[in-house]
Structures are given as C-alpha cells and as structure tokens.
Amino acid sequence: MVNDTVADMITRIRNANLVRQTNVQVIASNTTNSIASILKDEGFVEKIQTIETDSGLSSLLITLKYQGKRRKPYITALKRISKPGLRVYANSREIPRVLGGIGIAIISTSKGIMTDRRARHEKVGGEILCYVW
C-alpha cells in the first residue's frame, strides 16, 4: 500500500525518464489524474490512458515525450515539494516561479489542482505539490 500517491507517481515518472521508457503505469486517483492532465496540457507527456489492472483497480498509463534521435526527455526534473511530514503552502502572492517561468509548479487549491500561472491568475493559493521543468 502506498501512502503518498503523488510522490509515488513522481518517482515512477522520474525513473522511467532516466531509462528512456515510453510508458509508465501509476496508481489512479483524483489527484494523480489531475496532475497527469496538467502534465499533458503543458506538453510534458504525450498521452494518458486509464486502464484496469488484474486486481480490478484502475491505473494510469502515461506515455512520456522525448525529442530527437537521442530521445532527450521533455521532463528535465520533477521535484516533490510538499510532503506528508512537511506541508508547504503559499498564498497567491507567494507562489514561486520555477526557473524564472520556464518550469511549472503544480498547486492544490480550493478550486482544484492547477499550475502556478493559473493560480496566480485566479488569485488563489494552496499547497505546492511539485515542480516540473
């Protein structure tokens, strides 16, 4: 049983990127679905599919994106910020810019999970889940 599904998802994607795997399978939940759809909308992953496992649970099959013949990953780094032992919150004025706006921060707000740009635009703060660049 996984206690932190977000950290598990980030670790699986990071490990699959390191060995240049095309697909990675992660546990499906509302949070992981939202994070995966943000990664797809921002162009970090190619495709997301929901599949049923043998045990009857649903999981996400994420197709990672690579560029060029050397298959350089679009995701350079994924970093978990708010952890179960140390939660990190920010209001709309304190939301950090990742690499000067090149990367994104994924934030859990009262209006759902969204990117840092959208949270600043809607003037909502929340828990900073992870950074992606």
UniProtKB/Swiss-Prot annotation:
GO BP terms: translation
An annotated GO cellular component: ribosome
UniProt key word Plastid: yes
Coarse class of the protein's main subcellular location: plastid
Pfam families the record matches: Ribosomal_S8
PROSITE patterns, A to Z: RIBOSOMAL_S8
One MF term in the entry's GO annotations: rRNA binding
Protein name, as recorded: Small ribosomal subunit protein uS8c
InterPro entries: Ribosomal_uS8, Ribosomal_uS8_CS, Ribosomal_uS8_sf
Keyword Cytoplasm belongs to the record: no
Alphabetically ordered keywords of this record: Chloroplast, Plastid, Ribonucleoprotein, Ribosomal protein, RNA-binding, rRNA-binding
Source domain of life: Eukaryota
Its job: One of the primary rRNA binding proteins, it binds directly to 16S rRNA central domain where it helps coordinate assembly of the platform of the 30S subunit.
Family, per entry: Belongs to the universal ribosomal protein uS8 family.
Subunit and partners: Part of the 30S ribosomal subunit.
